[in-house]
Amino acid sequence: MSDSPVIALAKDLMSRNSVTPEDAGCQDVMIARLEKLDFVIETMVFDDTTNLWARRGTQAPLFVFAGHTDVVPAGSLEQWHTPPFEPTIIDGYLHGRGAADMKGSLACMIVSIERFLAEHPDHTGSIALLITSDEEGPFINGTTRVIDTLEARNEKIDMCIVGEPSSTHAVGDVVKNGRRGSITGDLTVKGIQGHVAYPHLADNPVHKALPALAELAATTWDNGNTYFPATSFQIANLASGTGASNVIPGEFDVQFNFRFSTELTDGEIKRRVHSILDAHGLNYDLKWTLSGHPFLTDEGTLVEAVVAAVEDVNHTKPALLTTGGTSDGRFIARTGAQVVELGPVNATIHKVNECVKAADLEKLTDMYQKVLEKSLV
């Protein structure tokens, strides 16, 4: 039996070894389909990253599908049941790297647009796709650079679906209508190196830092709100010493991360952390890396359309959550656009034997098409 249009396209994309930041021709496959639909194609290459901005129409509102063609490395090939870049259906599941994250979603986007335009060629507004090959990597030259380009020419996105695998047990059971912010601190506490037998001649930075770290870990940063859990502080890495048991270290390196809600700003986090470190009298350097601000789309046309579309297909309402890591939605949300994430089940993402139910991709295609209908008809 031949594959359905969405499965055939998903397999075509998945067969391409597009480990970040490689695109491996995936965007060319999408472009060939979009050109037949009269999309204006714009390829934006920034350093090692290939980005696609494809738009049909010039009127508002502008509805955008956003996603990425890059995937994480396959890892040990011996642990895969099937070759990771030879997509195969086994017992109703489509296996291969990118099945869930997120080439399956890309196929659903394209096919849903094709079907929507066949039925509604004179729809209101415009449709676009924003696709990058730099989501799984450092995310420097991908979506954020495309957004900078669009903003510079006053091209405004009104609504955006990001095809990240948002679902937990069944496709569409969870819709992400926001994400927590993420900020990382790289802390170096300075002391004086010495012999462990002569502690009075040294200054142990580990001993001095531990009470401060304990206070940071015990602090209630906020209580969250209706949409976000309380802000989380986690120590990720610790490093100190020479490896010898008789040397007091001269420095202590600590890396920690905050996943923060809309109750806090990155500025407030920095101020409170510095206040605690200073109160403990530490001599330190602290470098901050902000990965993204929290964002929330709590009401409006898009959330209503997505919830209704999922309910039409699944006959149950999805949960609206903000859990999980960061996504490229944060770069789009900063423009004021309504942003929602809707995609496949995420149980196997970034794992060996990544897979997704083939039937789920058919459902997701239907959901995307219904969102378009509810937003642009």
From Swiss-Prot:
Zn(2+) 1 binds at H68, D101, E164. Its EC number is 3.5.1.18. GO terms for biological process: diaminopimelate biosynthetic process; L-arginine biosynthetic process; lysine biosynthetic process via diaminopimelate. It catalyses: N-succinyl-(2S,6S)-2,6-diaminopimelate + H2O = (2S,6S)-2,6-diaminopimelate + succinate. It is an enzyme of class 3 (hydrolase). Zn(2+) 2 binds at D101, E136, H350. Its cofactor is Zn(2+); Co(2+). Keywords: Amino-acid biosynthesis, Cobalt, Diaminopimelate biosynthesis, Hydrolase, Lysine biosynthesis, Metal-binding, Zinc. Binds 2 Zn(2+) or Co(2+) ions per subunit. Pfam families: M20_dimer, Peptidase_M20. GO terms for molecular function: acetylornithine deacetylase activity; cobalt ion binding; succinyl-diaminopimelate desuccinylase activity; zinc ion binding. Pathway: Amino-acid biosynthesis; L-lysine biosynthesis via DAP pathway; LL-2,6-diaminopimelate from (S)-tetrahydrodipicolinate (succinylase route): step 3/3. The active site is at D70, E135 (proton acceptor). Belongs to the peptidase M20A family. DapE subfamily. Catalyzes the hydrolysis of N-succinyl-L,L-diaminopimelic acid (SDAP), forming succinate and LL-2,6-diaminopimelate (DAP), an intermediate involved in the bacterial biosynthesis of lysine and meso-diaminopimelic acid, an essential component of bacterial cell walls. Homodimer. This is Succinyl-diaminopimelate desuccinylase. It comes from Photobacterium profundum (strain SS9).
